[in-house]
Amino acid sequence: MIGRIVGTLIEKTPPELMVDVNGIGYEVSASMTTIYDLPQIGGQVTLFTHLLVKEDSHTLYGFIDKNERALFRVLIKVNGIGPKMALAILSSMSSEELITNVQESDVTALTRIPGVGKKTAERLIIELRDKLGQAAKTDLFSAPAVLRQVQADPRQEAEAALISLGYKPQEAAKAIAGVPVDAANSEDVIKAALKGMLRK
């Protein structure tokens, strides 16, 4: 899995980009939210990526921060929402706006997104409400400025990892709380938390 690319932006034809990484040009699909934040051609870019593999294609999707990528991954799990529609949604509103609209069951706001009718909006609300609520608790959808920091909080990263492994948010939080504060990084925190849960 390609999780991140760092290189020179050599083409920008929304929604497609090309990034040169050590002489190799990566074709990347991106939302307008990401594209608006990119430098001019020739500038250095860092994109968090999601590789979608199908029988007849390999498509790389790029995002300006982990926040947007996490939301993309949630969206493409919704019945009837493919990657193109997910990018359209991310291009139309911020992650914070989407979370708010889903939690408030605001069908009208969601139908303003191109290609999203009433039935699709209702399905988004039903299928996303719990998923987005859990994601918000892991701080995946916190302020972009925080998400772009190079050094993330290892305990938050570890808690998010445990939830992605299938543990409930409450279980993950309790397990992390029992880890000694001298754990150096998220990997150490995860290992210690898992050992603690296995002892119970």
UniProtKB/Swiss-Prot annotation:
GO cellular component: cytoplasm; Holliday junction helicase complex; Holliday junction resolvase complex
One MF term in the entry's GO annotations: four-way junction helicase activity
Residue segments, region Domain III: 150-200
Keyword DNA-binding annotated: yes
Stretch list, region Domain II: 65-143
Region (Flexible linker) location: 144-149
Family recorded in the similarity comment: Belongs to the RuvA family.
HAMAP family in UniProt: DNA_HJ_migration_RuvA (MF_00031)
NCBIfam families reported in the protein's UniProt record: ruvA
Protein name: Holliday junction branch migration complex subunit RuvA
Lineage: Bacteria, Pseudomonadati, Pseudomonadota, Gammaproteobacteria, Oceanospirillales
